[in-house]
A protein has these predicted regions:
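Short glycine/proline-enriched turns and hinge-like loops at secondary-structure junctions
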Residues: 35-38
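Short hydrophobic/aromatic beta-strand micro-patches
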Residues: 43-45
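Catalytic core of pol beta-like nucleotidyltransferases
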Residues: 1-22, 30-32, 47-132
Length: 132
């Protein structure tokens, strides 16, 4: 199954669900680096709360459809590096611009706040490596 096959089947699956406003494909399939054993990672945004039962139903149906493991994340609960990971390589399966922009900005603000800390940590590690 190709990357485009996965995208097309996800679009078809979610096209009939009006409660789910946005679906983002991320991870190795989104990047095009997947293999036959790779899982499929999707993040959902819903008008209604995504209960465990709803997420489990979607996960199970998609696992059967694709015959591979499916990871389903609730975008409302995604934060920090996880949200940044989703938003930086997302393929838009079902798209709502206002919602997308809100979460992209949230991820960007996190990255901008976290970047100085990350750089300082990397510099300290490099100094330790160079100094033995």
């Amino acid at each position: 199954m190709t990357r485009q096959d996965i995208i097309d089947r996800l679009k078809d699956y979610f096209s009939h669900d009006d409660d789910i406003e946005m679906v983002l494909l991320y991870g190795s399939v989104a990047k095009g680096t997947f293999n036959p054993k790779s899982d499929i990672d999707i993040a959902l945004y819903s008008k209604k709360e995504l209960s465990f039962e709803v997420l489990a139903k979607i996960q199970t149906e998609l696992a059967i459809m694709f015959d591979r493991e499916i990871d389903v994340a609730d975008l409302k609960k995604a934060e920090g590096t996880f949200l940044y990971q989703i938003m930086t390589n997302a393929v838009k399966i079902k798209f709502e611009e206002n919602i997308y922009v809100r979460y992209a900005m949230k991820a960007l603000y996190f990255y901008e706040d976290f970047l100085p800390i990350l750089r300082r940590t990397q510099e300290e590690k490099l100094k330790r490596m160079l100094n033995g």
